[in-house]
Each structure stands twice: as C-alpha cells, then as structure tokens.
C-alpha cells in the first residue's frame, strides 16, 4: 500500500476538502483519468485501480499514478468509550478535488487506454472522465 515513509506528525486534523485541483494537466503520458467529483481515495483503492489497469494493458505501455495518500485517518477501536484521546491511524487517504489527474497511460492505443480506465473507474468511489493530451 502507498503511505509516506515518515511524517512530521503522526495524526492530522480532519480539515475540509475545498477548492479546485492544481494538477489538472497531463504531464507524463498521452491519456489520463481526470476526477470530476470531490472525494478521497484510500491507498487500497489507488492500488486496486492500478492493478486493474496494468492487467488490462498486459505489460505494454507505462502507467503513472499522479495521486499519493498523505493524510492519515484515525479510528478508535470498537466498544471503546468516547474521550481518552484520538484513535490510532487506520489508513491513509489522498484528498481529490475536481479536475485532478489521477492516472496517466502512454505507449498504448486509445481504445486500450479507454478500456483500462473504465476498469479503474469501477474501483474508485468518485466519478472520472477520460482525457487526451493537448498537442499544440
């Protein structure tokens, strides 16, 4: 699973997921998967979508993951009373804003890329769209 090697602080406040994305252009590949909806992706969801894509393109082409789960989510154990401090870190998430590029693919045809992204979208909890690199 994806998670930071080390962080300055173990736990983080909840915060809010507002605004639009900074990474809204394709930088590495020819095709991309862009988020339309706001949400958060766990490291398991990111890895599951990556596996689905890499299986569908059958070791041809290259995949880039453009999101990284750097926010820890804590959870208290079952049947524990409130209070006594914040719970332990349960999993890591990446906050997603509309317009963010999640994955990129290169060195495959457009039909294969569309099919791979369709499989990946089924694993993700947010709505996404297929985008091409703009060549000027």
Swiss-Prot record:
Pfam families: Ribosomal_L16 (PF00252). GO terms for biological process: translation. One of its GO terms (molecular function) is rRNA binding. Keywords: Ribonucleoprotein, Ribosomal protein, RNA-binding, rRNA-binding, tRNA-binding. InterPro entries: Ribosomal_uL16, Ribosomal_uL16_bact-type, Ribosomal_uL16_CS, Ribosomal_uL16_dom, Ribosomal_uL16_sf. SUPFAM superfamilies: Ribosomal protein L16p/L10e (SSF54686). Disulfide bonds: none annotated. GO terms for cellular component: cytosolic large ribosomal subunit. The keyword Disulfide bond does not apply. Binds 23S rRNA and is also seen to make contacts with the A and possibly P site tRNAs. Belongs to the universal ribosomal protein uL16 family. NCBIfam families: rplP_bact (TIGR01164). Part of the 50S ribosomal subunit. This is Large ribosomal subunit protein uL16. The gene is rplP.
């Amino acid at each position: 699973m994806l998670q930071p090697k080390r962080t300055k602080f173990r736990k983080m406040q909840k915060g809010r997921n507002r605004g639009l994305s900074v990474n809204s252009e394709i930088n590495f590949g020819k095709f991309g998967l862009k988020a339309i909806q706001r949400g958060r992706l766990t490291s398991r969801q990111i890895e599951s979508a990556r596996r689905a894509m890499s299986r569908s393109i059958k070791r041809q082409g290259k995949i880039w993951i453009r999101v990284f789960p750097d926010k820890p989510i804590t959870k208290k154990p079952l049947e524990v009373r409130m209070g006594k401090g914040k719970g332990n870190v349960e999993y890591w998430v990446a906050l997603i804003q509309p317009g963010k590029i999640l994955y990129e693919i290169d060195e495959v045809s457009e039909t294969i890329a569309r099919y791979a992204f369709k499989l990946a979208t089924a694993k993700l909890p947010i709505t996404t769209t297929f985008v091409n690199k703009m060549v000027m």
